[in-house]
Regions:
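N-terminal catalytic or cofactor-binding beta/alpha core of small enzyme domains
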Residues: 1-31, 36-122
Length: 122
C-alpha cells in the first residue's frame, strides 16, 4: 500500500494523521518511508537506504514526527542554511527521475523477474 502521492501527498500538516492511519490499518507491517532529502553537494543524485525511522523536515529545520522502520531517501539538494525555499529550486525532473529509480528498485527487490540476478552497469 502506498500512502502519499503527487495527487494526495503526505506533508507536515497531515503527517501525524497518515502515520496513525498506517499503524492502525497495517499494525504488523514493516513501514518503508521514502522522501527527498538534502545532503552534501557531492551526494546530490544519490539514493540512501537505511534501518530506522526517517526524520522528515530536518533539511529545512522542522521538527516532525519520525516515520518508518526502513528509510529510503533521494538526495536532491545540498544542505545549507535550513532555507525552506531552497527545496523549491530543485528541478522536478530530478525528483521524478529519482522517484522512478527508487520505485523500480523496490519493485525489483520485492518481485524479482526470473534470472534477474545481475545487471550490467558499464
Amino acid at each position: 500500500q502506498v500512502v502519499g502521492t503527487l495527487d494526495c501527498p503526505v506533508h507536515a500538516m497531515n503527517l501525524e494523521q497518515a502515520i496513525f492511519m498506517v499503524r492502525r490499518c497495517y499494525p504488523d507491517h514493516v513501514i518503508v518511508a521514502v522522501d527527498a532529502s538534502v545532503g552534501r553537494s557531492e551526494h546530490v543524485g544519490c539514493v540512501t537506504l537505511g534501518k530506522g525511522a526517517l526524520r522528515p523536515g530536518l533539511g529545512v529545520c522542522k521538527e516532525l514526527q519520525a516515520v518508518g522502520d526502513i528509510f529510503i531517501t533521494g538526495i536532491v539538494g545540498g544542505c545549507g542554511s535550513c532555507d525552506p525555499l531552497m527545496l523549491q529550486s530543485v528541478r522536478l525532473s530530478v525528483v521524478m527521475r529519482m522517484a522512478d529509480y527508487i520505485c523500480d528498485s523496490v519493485r525489483q527487490a520485492l518481485v524479482p523477474e526470473p534470472h534477474n540476478f545481475c545487471r550490467r552497469v558499464l
